[in-house]
Regions:
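Long, low-complexity, tandem-repeat intrinsically disordered regions
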Residues: 1-2, 17
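Sec/Tat signal peptide C-region and signal peptidase I cleavage site
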Residues: 19-25
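Bacterial N-terminal signal peptides
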Residues: 9-19
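Extracytosolic ligand-binding ectodomains
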Residues: 2-6, 10-11, 25-364
Length: 364
Protein backbone atom coordinates (compact mmCIF):
# COMPACT_ATOMS: atom_id res chain seq x y z
CA UNK A 1 0.00 0.00 0.00
CA UNK A 2 1.30 3.44 -0.85
CA UNK A 3 0.04 6.80 0.25
CA UNK A 4 2.21 9.72 -0.73
CA UNK A 5 4.01 11.43 2.18
CA UNK A 6 3.34 9.70 2.40
CA UNK A 7 3.00 6.23 3.72
CA UNK A 8 4.58 3.15 2.28
CA UNK A 9 3.08 0.14 4.00
CA UNK A 10 4.81 -3.15 4.80
CA UNK A 11 5.07 -4.53 1.30
CA UNK A 12 7.85 -6.53 2.38
CA UNK A 13 5.49 -6.13 1.35
CA UNK A 14 18.80 -9.45 -19.33
CA UNK A 15 21.51 -10.82 -20.61
CA UNK A 16 22.61 -9.85 -24.12
CA UNK A 17 24.40 -12.33 -26.31
CA UNK A 18 27.61 -10.70 -27.43
CA UNK A 19 31.07 -11.65 -28.54
CA UNK A 20 32.47 -8.72 -26.56
CA UNK A 21 33.80 -9.06 -23.04
CA UNK A 22 31.01 -9.39 -20.45
CA UNK A 23 29.87 -6.22 -18.71
CA UNK A 24 30.37 -6.50 -14.99
CA UNK A 25 27.46 -5.43 -12.81
CA UNK A 26 28.19 -2.35 -10.76
CA UNK A 27 27.41 -1.89 -7.10
CA UNK A 28 24.55 0.43 -6.17
CA UNK A 29 24.98 3.07 -3.49
CA UNK A 30 22.06 3.67 -1.13
CA UNK A 31 22.33 6.08 1.78
CA UNK A 32 21.06 5.84 5.33
CA UNK A 33 20.64 9.34 6.75
CA UNK A 34 20.22 8.72 10.46
CA UNK A 35 19.97 10.99 13.46
CA UNK A 36 22.94 9.32 15.12
CA UNK A 37 23.64 12.22 17.45
CA UNK A 38 21.28 14.65 19.11
CA UNK A 39 18.00 14.17 20.94
CA UNK A 40 17.06 10.74 19.54
CA UNK A 41 20.53 9.20 19.42
CA UNK A 42 19.44 6.34 21.69
CA UNK A 43 16.73 5.41 19.18
CA UNK A 44 18.90 5.60 16.08
CA UNK A 45 21.10 2.45 16.11
CA UNK A 46 18.25 -0.10 15.78
CA UNK A 47 16.70 1.98 13.00
CA UNK A 48 19.95 2.03 11.04
CA UNK A 49 20.32 -1.70 11.68
CA UNK A 50 16.81 -2.34 10.35
CA UNK A 51 17.59 -0.70 7.02
CA UNK A 52 20.96 -2.42 6.83
CA UNK A 53 19.30 -5.78 7.46
CA UNK A 54 17.20 -5.31 4.33
CA UNK A 55 20.31 -4.47 2.30
CA UNK A 56 22.17 -7.48 3.69
CA UNK A 57 19.34 -9.78 2.61
CA UNK A 58 19.34 -8.34 -0.89
CA UNK A 59 23.09 -8.85 -1.18
CA UNK A 60 22.83 -12.42 0.12
CA UNK A 61 20.17 -13.30 -2.47
CA UNK A 62 21.95 -12.28 -5.64
CA UNK A 63 22.27 -8.56 -5.12
CA UNK A 64 20.69 -5.55 -6.78
CA UNK A 65 20.83 -5.31 -10.59
CA UNK A 66 23.42 -8.06 -10.40
CA UNK A 67 25.71 -6.03 -8.16
CA UNK A 68 25.80 -5.38 -4.43
CA UNK A 69 24.21 -2.65 -2.35
CA UNK A 70 26.83 -0.43 -0.77
CA UNK A 71 25.27 1.50 2.10
CA UNK A 72 26.64 4.86 3.16
CA UNK A 73 25.58 6.25 6.53
CA UNK A 74 25.27 9.94 7.32
CA UNK A 75 24.29 11.82 10.47
CA UNK A 76 21.53 14.44 10.31
CA UNK A 77 21.48 14.90 14.12
CA UNK A 78 17.68 15.42 14.22
CA UNK A 79 18.44 18.96 13.08
CA UNK A 80 17.28 20.62 9.83
CA UNK A 81 20.47 22.66 9.66
CA UNK A 82 22.77 19.67 10.09
CA UNK A 83 20.65 17.55 7.76
CA UNK A 84 21.37 19.77 4.76
CA UNK A 85 25.14 19.20 4.55
CA UNK A 86 24.76 15.54 5.52
CA UNK A 87 22.28 14.97 2.71
CA UNK A 88 24.38 17.01 0.30
CA UNK A 89 27.31 14.66 0.91
CA UNK A 90 25.18 11.59 0.20
CA UNK A 91 23.57 13.10 -2.89
CA UNK A 92 26.40 15.03 -4.52
CA UNK A 93 29.64 13.54 -3.18
CA UNK A 94 28.77 9.90 -2.56
CA UNK A 95 26.30 9.90 -5.47
CA UNK A 96 23.75 7.60 -3.86
CA UNK A 97 20.80 6.51 -5.96
CA UNK A 98 18.39 7.00 -3.05
CA UNK A 99 18.45 7.05 0.72
CA UNK A 100 16.58 5.95 3.82
CA UNK A 101 15.98 8.85 6.19
CA UNK A 102 16.10 11.06 7.91
CA UNK A 103 14.52 9.96 11.18
CA UNK A 104 13.18 13.24 12.60
CA UNK A 105 10.67 15.22 10.56
CA UNK A 106 12.63 18.47 10.62
CA UNK A 107 15.79 16.71 9.48
CA UNK A 108 13.86 14.86 6.78
CA UNK A 109 12.45 18.09 5.37
CA UNK A 110 15.81 19.84 5.73
CA UNK A 111 17.56 17.05 3.84
CA UNK A 112 14.93 17.06 1.12
CA UNK A 113 14.98 20.80 0.55
CA UNK A 114 18.76 21.14 0.67
CA UNK A 115 19.80 18.18 -1.46
CA UNK A 116 17.23 15.47 -2.07
CA UNK A 117 14.71 17.40 -4.15
CA UNK A 118 17.29 19.44 -6.11
CA UNK A 119 19.19 16.22 -6.79
CA UNK A 120 16.09 14.26 -7.91
CA UNK A 121 16.75 11.70 -5.18
CA UNK A 122 14.03 9.52 -3.66
CA UNK A 123 14.12 9.29 0.12
CA UNK A 124 12.00 7.23 2.49
CA UNK A 125 11.88 8.11 6.18
CA UNK A 126 10.99 5.27 8.53
CA UNK A 127 9.94 7.60 11.33
CA UNK A 128 9.25 11.20 10.24
CA UNK A 129 5.67 11.43 11.41
CA UNK A 130 4.72 15.13 11.48
CA UNK A 131 1.77 16.20 9.31
CA UNK A 132 4.04 18.86 7.77
CA UNK A 133 5.63 16.18 5.62
CA UNK A 134 2.31 15.53 3.92
CA UNK A 135 2.15 18.99 2.36
CA UNK A 136 5.82 19.27 1.40
CA UNK A 137 6.28 20.26 -2.25
CA UNK A 138 8.68 17.46 -3.08
CA UNK A 139 8.24 16.49 -6.75
CA UNK A 140 7.02 13.09 -5.53
CA UNK A 141 10.40 12.23 -4.01
CA UNK A 142 9.78 12.08 -0.25
CA UNK A 143 7.98 9.13 1.36
CA UNK A 144 7.61 7.52 4.76
CA UNK A 145 6.79 4.09 6.15
CA UNK A 146 5.19 5.29 9.39
CA UNK A 147 1.75 6.84 9.87
CA UNK A 148 1.35 10.59 10.21
CA UNK A 149 1.00 12.09 13.67
CA UNK A 150 -2.46 13.07 12.52
CA UNK A 151 -3.12 9.45 13.52
CA UNK A 152 -0.84 9.22 16.57
CA UNK A 153 -2.26 12.38 18.14
CA UNK A 154 -5.77 10.98 17.93
CA UNK A 155 -4.67 7.66 19.41
CA UNK A 156 -2.89 9.40 22.30
CA UNK A 157 -6.01 11.41 23.11
CA UNK A 158 -8.20 8.33 22.91
CA UNK A 159 -5.79 6.39 25.15
CA UNK A 160 -6.04 9.02 27.88
CA UNK A 161 -9.80 9.15 27.58
CA UNK A 162 -10.00 5.37 27.90
CA UNK A 163 -7.88 5.60 31.05
CA UNK A 164 -10.34 8.05 32.55
CA UNK A 165 -8.05 11.07 32.30
CA UNK A 166 -10.12 14.26 32.02
CA UNK A 167 -7.47 16.98 32.28
CA UNK A 168 -3.80 17.28 31.33
CA UNK A 169 -0.91 19.69 31.28
CA UNK A 170 0.85 19.46 27.91
CA UNK A 171 4.36 20.41 26.86
CA UNK A 172 5.77 19.86 23.39
CA UNK A 173 9.10 20.42 21.65
CA UNK A 174 8.89 23.51 19.48
CA UNK A 175 9.35 22.07 15.99
CA UNK A 176 7.25 20.54 13.21
CA UNK A 177 7.06 17.20 14.99
CA UNK A 178 6.11 18.59 18.38
CA UNK A 179 3.64 21.24 17.28
CA UNK A 180 1.95 19.04 14.71
CA UNK A 181 1.43 16.24 17.19
CA UNK A 182 0.33 18.59 19.96
CA UNK A 183 -2.26 20.29 17.76
CA UNK A 184 -3.85 17.00 16.77
CA UNK A 185 -3.80 15.72 20.35
CA UNK A 186 -5.43 18.85 21.79
CA UNK A 187 -8.18 18.87 19.18
CA UNK A 188 -9.06 15.21 19.77
CA UNK A 189 -8.73 15.29 23.56
CA UNK A 190 -11.04 18.29 23.80
CA UNK A 191 -13.45 16.63 21.37
CA UNK A 192 -13.47 13.68 23.77
CA UNK A 193 -14.55 16.02 26.55
CA UNK A 194 -11.13 16.49 28.12
CA UNK A 195 -9.47 19.72 29.24
CA UNK A 196 -5.94 20.84 28.39
CA UNK A 197 -5.23 22.92 31.48
CA UNK A 198 -1.85 24.14 30.22
CA UNK A 199 -0.25 24.01 26.78
CA UNK A 200 3.41 25.04 26.87
CA UNK A 201 6.01 24.70 24.13
CA UNK A 202 9.69 24.20 24.95
CA UNK A 203 12.99 24.32 23.11
CA UNK A 204 15.04 21.16 22.90
CA UNK A 205 18.54 20.96 24.35
CA UNK A 206 18.13 23.12 27.46
CA UNK A 207 19.57 22.15 30.82
CA UNK A 208 16.73 23.63 32.85
CA UNK A 209 12.99 23.44 32.21
CA UNK A 210 11.81 24.51 35.65
CA UNK A 211 10.21 27.68 34.29
CA UNK A 212 8.11 25.66 31.85
CA UNK A 213 7.31 23.13 34.56
CA UNK A 214 6.18 25.96 36.81
CA UNK A 215 3.65 27.05 34.20
CA UNK A 216 2.48 23.48 33.74
CA UNK A 217 2.18 22.77 37.46
CA UNK A 218 0.29 26.03 37.94
CA UNK A 219 -2.58 24.58 35.94
CA UNK A 220 -3.35 22.21 38.78
CA UNK A 221 -3.41 19.11 36.60
CA UNK A 222 -1.69 16.01 37.96
CA UNK A 223 -1.28 14.52 34.47
CA UNK A 224 1.68 15.60 32.33
CA UNK A 225 1.74 14.86 28.60
CA UNK A 226 5.26 15.12 27.25
CA UNK A 227 6.08 15.44 23.54
CA UNK A 228 9.83 15.51 23.06
CA UNK A 229 12.90 13.32 22.61
CA UNK A 230 14.30 10.62 24.88
CA UNK A 231 17.89 11.83 24.62
CA UNK A 232 16.90 15.49 24.79
CA UNK A 233 14.12 17.51 26.36
CA UNK A 234 11.95 14.57 27.39
CA UNK A 235 14.55 13.14 29.75
CA UNK A 236 15.40 16.47 31.36
CA UNK A 237 11.78 17.55 31.77
CA UNK A 238 10.78 14.19 33.21
CA UNK A 239 13.70 14.21 35.64
CA UNK A 240 12.95 17.73 36.84
CA UNK A 241 9.22 17.02 37.01
CA UNK A 242 9.91 14.06 39.28
CA UNK A 243 12.17 16.21 41.44
CA UNK A 244 9.44 18.85 41.73
CA UNK A 245 6.78 16.32 42.64
CA UNK A 246 3.98 18.25 40.97
CA UNK A 247 2.66 15.46 38.73
CA UNK A 248 1.35 12.00 39.51
CA UNK A 249 1.01 10.46 36.05
CA UNK A 250 3.09 10.86 32.89
CA UNK A 251 2.25 10.25 29.25
CA UNK A 252 4.44 10.44 26.17
CA UNK A 253 4.76 9.71 22.47
CA UNK A 254 7.11 7.79 20.19
CA UNK A 255 9.92 10.33 20.56
CA UNK A 256 10.26 9.73 24.29
CA UNK A 257 10.79 6.00 23.90
CA UNK A 258 14.48 5.25 24.32
CA UNK A 259 17.09 4.02 26.77
CA UNK A 260 18.04 7.56 27.80
CA UNK A 261 14.59 8.58 29.00
CA UNK A 262 14.85 7.11 32.50
CA UNK A 263 18.59 7.56 33.01
CA UNK A 264 19.11 8.65 36.62
CA UNK A 265 15.37 8.51 37.38
CA UNK A 266 13.87 6.15 39.94
CA UNK A 267 11.41 3.99 37.92
CA UNK A 268 9.10 3.87 40.92
CA UNK A 269 8.61 7.62 40.61
CA UNK A 270 7.20 7.29 37.09
CA UNK A 271 5.28 4.07 37.54
CA UNK A 272 2.42 3.91 35.07
CA UNK A 273 4.13 6.06 32.45
CA UNK A 274 2.49 5.34 29.09
CA UNK A 275 3.61 6.27 25.58
CA UNK A 276 2.27 5.78 22.08
CA UNK A 277 4.26 4.70 19.06
CA UNK A 278 3.64 3.19 15.64
CA UNK A 279 1.64 0.01 16.13
CA UNK A 280 3.24 -3.39 15.94
CA UNK A 281 2.95 -5.15 12.63
CA UNK A 282 0.55 -8.07 12.59
CA UNK A 283 -0.11 -10.91 10.20
CA UNK A 284 2.09 -13.16 8.10
CA UNK A 285 4.58 -10.49 7.04
CA UNK A 286 5.05 -9.40 10.64
CA UNK A 287 5.84 -12.93 11.79
CA UNK A 288 8.35 -13.39 8.97
CA UNK A 289 10.05 -10.11 9.84
CA UNK A 290 10.24 -11.02 13.52
CA UNK A 291 12.08 -14.24 12.68
CA UNK A 292 14.42 -12.47 10.24
CA UNK A 293 15.30 -9.80 12.79
CA UNK A 294 15.70 -12.27 15.65
CA UNK A 295 17.95 -14.53 13.58
CA UNK A 296 20.09 -11.47 12.80
CA UNK A 297 20.44 -10.67 16.49
CA UNK A 298 18.14 -7.65 16.31
CA UNK A 299 15.14 -6.74 18.42
CA UNK A 300 12.11 -7.03 16.11
CA UNK A 301 10.14 -4.74 18.41
CA UNK A 302 12.69 -1.91 18.42
CA UNK A 303 11.00 1.41 17.71
CA UNK A 304 10.93 2.10 13.95
CA UNK A 305 13.29 -0.77 13.11
CA UNK A 306 10.58 -2.63 11.12
CA UNK A 307 9.73 0.57 9.27
CA UNK A 308 13.41 1.04 8.43
CA UNK A 309 13.64 -2.51 7.10
CA UNK A 310 10.58 -1.79 5.00
CA UNK A 311 12.08 1.44 3.66
CA UNK A 312 15.34 -0.23 2.69
CA UNK A 313 13.65 -3.19 1.03
CA UNK A 314 11.27 -0.95 -0.88
CA UNK A 315 14.09 1.18 -2.24
CA UNK A 316 15.88 -1.93 -3.46
CA UNK A 317 12.70 -3.21 -5.12
CA UNK A 318 12.13 0.13 -6.81
CA UNK A 319 15.69 0.28 -8.16
CA UNK A 320 15.41 -3.27 -9.49
CA UNK A 321 12.08 -2.39 -11.08
CA UNK A 322 13.57 0.77 -12.59
CA UNK A 323 16.20 -1.37 -14.27
CA UNK A 324 19.17 0.83 -13.43
CA UNK A 325 20.80 2.83 -10.66
CA UNK A 326 19.59 6.04 -12.30
CA UNK A 327 17.58 8.45 -10.19
CA UNK A 328 15.28 9.16 -13.12
CA UNK A 329 12.05 7.20 -12.97
CA UNK A 330 12.70 5.82 -9.50
CA UNK A 331 9.75 7.53 -7.84
CA UNK A 332 7.33 6.01 -10.36
CA UNK A 333 8.97 2.60 -9.93
CA UNK A 334 8.59 2.88 -6.17
CA UNK A 335 4.89 3.47 -6.52
CA UNK A 336 4.60 0.44 -8.79
CA UNK A 337 6.27 -1.99 -6.39
CA UNK A 338 4.58 -0.61 -3.28
CA UNK A 339 1.02 -0.49 -4.54
CA UNK A 340 -1.69 -2.97 -5.42
CA UNK A 341 -2.46 -4.84 -7.56
CA UNK A 342 0.34 -7.34 -7.72
CA UNK A 343 1.78 -10.49 -6.21
CA UNK A 344 2.58 -9.87 -2.56
CA UNK A 345 6.24 -9.84 -1.60
CA UNK A 346 6.96 -10.74 2.02
CA UNK A 347 10.02 -9.68 4.02
CA UNK A 348 13.10 -11.50 2.80
CA UNK A 349 11.61 -12.61 -0.51
CA UNK A 350 14.14 -10.76 -2.63
CA UNK A 351 14.97 -13.57 -5.06
CA UNK A 352 11.27 -14.17 -5.69
CA UNK A 353 10.69 -10.47 -6.31
CA UNK A 354 13.54 -10.25 -8.82
CA UNK A 355 12.18 -13.21 -10.80
CA UNK A 356 8.73 -11.62 -10.95
CA UNK A 357 10.10 -8.23 -11.96
CA UNK A 358 12.17 -9.78 -14.75
CA UNK A 359 9.08 -11.66 -15.92
CA UNK A 360 7.10 -8.44 -16.07
CA UNK A 361 4.77 -9.47 -13.27
CA UNK A 362 3.31 -6.79 -11.00
CA UNK A 363 4.36 -7.00 -7.37
CA UNK A 364 3.05 -5.41 -4.22
Amino acid sequence: MLVNKKLLGLAVAASVLSLAAPVLAEDVKIGILGDLTGPIESLAPPIVAGAQLAFDQVNAQGGLLGGQIVSIVGDSACDPTAAGPAADKLVNTDQVTAFVGAFCTGATIGAANAAGIPGNVVQISPSASAPALTTLEDNDLVFRTTPSDAFQGVKLADLLTQKGVTDVALTYVNNDYGKGLADVFVKQFEANGGTVSANVSHEDGKADYRAELGQLAGSGSQNLVLIGYASGSAHTILQQAVEGGDFAVFFGVDGVIGDDLLAGIDPAKVEGLSATRAGAYTGESAEIYKKIATDAGQDPAATYAPQAYDAGFLLALAIEKNGSASRDGLSAALREVASAPGEIIRPGEWAKAVELIKAGTDID
